[in-house]
From Swiss-Prot:
A Pfam family annotated for this UniProt entry: GTP_EFTU_D2
Predominant localisation class: membrane
Molecular function terms from GO: GTP binding; GTPase activity; ribosome binding; translation elongation factor activity
Protein name (record): Elongation factor 4
Organism field: Leptospira interrogans serogroup Icterohaemorrhagiae serovar Lai (strain 56601)
Length: 600
């Protein structure tokens, strides 16, 4: 190990959403003098506006700073920031791959939450050193002793190693850096071996092309080197290497154990896949960095421009967004109701909301999303097996042998008094209870197996409202199970509207159909003719409502008494309405499509 290597510390901060991770990162960077009063702003590592506004971290980010420790040595600190929301677990797992240790933040006023546990397990899988940090000790509700007990009992960590801080006021934050130098090991690796570096993130810059963030495990890399991407076999020449001190700072070379970036004239992020291994073209390493998993989309939905003329702009925008979002999957699709658009695969509902918001914001588009769906398995009587995520591809019921849907193992951590509410919510969502564990006297961990389709449909919102926001949720896929699935069509004026179709469990079809139709009745404006609204499965109508006709006063121009004249005009109007009804196209406003997403 080189002298320089023993003074490098690569660490990540993991926490449940809202436990103060980005605030602690800000304080560490202030101590490392990366930010000064001129560059200082809150959540410095959250580079997107949307991250600051929502108070969440979406993209994994990083910063390098120097720290003069009490032992008289100057350490190079590489902080890799990670997201806390369950949708972005893949961003967490790849940042952890580049670290030797993590700071695990626990909010001293809230205690251990579901995401704390999930991220802890990710860190344990990678065999990282874990340093517990109790944050928000300045709050009146903070209970440090109780939090220490939870750290020992729920997390299985040594409470004596825990550091109590307030990231907001800066209290005791320096002690965190001292403990990093003492508890988190320096990076291993051989600086004389062939180059082996992990791509843990990459993003597209319009001026420089793709900027690749890497962690060097063996060897070194410098400007002018010809590099090879091991998964694609493509090679490039390095134009610049450096480290990120909030801004990209070029340097001569990157050595073993360092975290930094390279720019090599790469045009597409798909040529620098996250999790890929970079090596030298002339002297490649024998094996790539192990253990990386590709992010798999869990939720699928149609995405259409409200104005059909914006389709080309949407194509351009979604291609550009894909450059910075490795988990986004999409293919073109067309809908009779909405025209041309895309079928998009997302990591979860928050990811879906954020992608739509970024497309609308950054590319000035007006978009509409259809009801989200998951990937179902359909087994046909002729032996074929098909995976579908789009209701339009659901086969005729007569040809189906069996259907299966994905389940997830969901962990809910809640205060004691809300257990009853959560149990009834889980039952309503077809959940199967697996386990109940009392973490403390007043905190319970409930584990359920729940269909993913039920989880993505308002489960999180209802969980928060049933528990006044105190419960937390984490989930992981647990495989497919046989399920009675049907395709439900919504008919407006006798015509099925493809964008409103959905795949539902047979037991839920009537309830969902009725909810949607009642919503549509309020949202579709009255026309000059009556509009029947129906929810149907196969040929069977499950629910029906009607929007009454708008009556135009055709007799207004008749002054005085001639009753036969009035009758004649009313008959004429009736005829006209009949004709209008046959060719009558009902205008469905955009809110109607959005309402289907939120029928509670």
């Amino acid at each position: 190990m080189s002298d320089k290597q023993q003074f490098i510390r690569n660490f990540s901060i993991i926490a449940h959403i809202d436990h103060g991770k980005s605030t602690l990162a800000d304080r560490l960077l202030e101590i490392g003098q990366v930010t000064n009063d001129r560059t200082k702003k809150d959540q410095i590592l959250d580079s997107m506006d949307i991250e600051r506004e929502r108070g969440i971290t979406i993209k994994a980010n990083n910063a390098t700073f120097d720290y003069l420790a009490e032992d008289g040595n100057t350490y190079i600190m590489n902080l890799l920031d990670t997201p806390g929301h369950v949708d972005f677990t893949y961003e967490v797992s790849r940042s952890l791959k580049a670290c030797e240790g993590v700071l695990l933040i626990v909010d001293a006023s809230q205690g251990v939450e579901a995401q704390t546990l999930a991220n802890l397990y990710l860190a344990m899988e990678q065999d990282l050193e874990i340093l517990p940090v109790m944050n928000k000790i300045d709050l009146p509700a903070a209970d440090v002793e109780k939090t220490k007990i939870q750290i020992e009992e729920s997390l299985g960590l040594d409470p004596q190693k825990a550091v109590a801080i307030s990231a907001k006021t800066g209290l005791n934050v320096k002690e965190v850096l001292e403990q990093i130098t003492k508890q988190i090991p320096s990076p291993k690796g051989n600086s004389n071996a062939p180059l082996k570096a992990l791509v843990y993130d990459s993003y597209f810059d319009p001026y420089m092309g793709v900027v690749i963030k890497i962690r060097i495990f063996d060897g070194r890399i410098k400007k002018g080197d010809r590099i090879l991407m091991m998964s694609t076999g493509k090679d490039f020449t390095v134009n610049e290497v450096g480290i990120n001190r909030i801004n990209l700072t070029p340097k001569e070379s990157l050595e073993t154990g360092e975290v930094g970036y390279i720019i090599a004239g790469i045009k597409k992020v798909s040529d620098a896949k996250t999790g890929d291994t970079v090596t030298l073209f002339s002297n490649p390493t024998k094996e790539s960095v192990p253990g990386y998993k590709e992010a798999k989309p869990m939720v699928f939905a149609g995405l259409f421009p409200i104005n059909g003329e914006q389709f080309d702009e949407l194509v351009d925008a979604i291609e550009k967004l894909k450059l910075n979002d490795a988990a986004l999957v999409f293919e073109k699709e067309s809908s009779i109701a909405l025209g041309f658009g895309f079928r998009v695969g997302y990591l979860g509902l928050l990811h879906m909301e954020i992608v739509q918001e970024r497309l609308e914001r950054e590319f000035n588009l007006d978009l509409i999303t259809t009801a989200p769906s998951v990937k179902y398995i359909i087994r046909s009587k002729n032996g074929e097996v098909e995976e579908i995520d789009n209701p339009s591809r659901f086969p005729e019921p007569i040809t189906i042998e069996s259907t299966e849907e994905p389940y997830v193992k969901a962990t809910v951590i809640t205060p004691n008094e809300y257990v009853g509410n959560i149990m009834s919510l889980a039952m309503d969502k077809r959940g199967i209870q697996l386990d109940t564990v009392y973490l403390t006297q007043d905190k319970v961990q409930l584990t359920y197996e729940i269909p993913l389709a039920e989880l993505i449909f308002e489960f999180y919102d209802k969980l928060k409202s049933f528990t006044r926001g105190y419960a937390s949720l984490d989930y992981e896929p647990s495989g497919y199970k046989a399920s009675q699935l049907v395709k439900m069509d919504i008919l407006v004026n006798g015509e099925p509207v493809d964008a409103l179709s959905m795949i539902v469990h047979r037991s839920k079809a009537e309830q969902r159909g009725r909810e949607i139709i009642e919503k549509l009745k309020d949202l579709i404006p009255r026309h000059q003719f009556m509009i029947p609204l129906q929810a149907a499965v196969g040929g069977k109508i499950l629910a029906r409502e009607s929007i009454s006709a708008l009556r135009k006063n055709v007799t207004a121009k008749c002054y005085g008494g001639d009753i036969t004249r009035k009758k004649k005009l009313l008959e004429k109007q009736k005829e006209g309405k009949k004709r209008m009804k046959q060719i009558g196209n009902v205008e469905i406003p955009q809110e109607a499509f959005l309402a289907v997403l939120k029928t509670s």
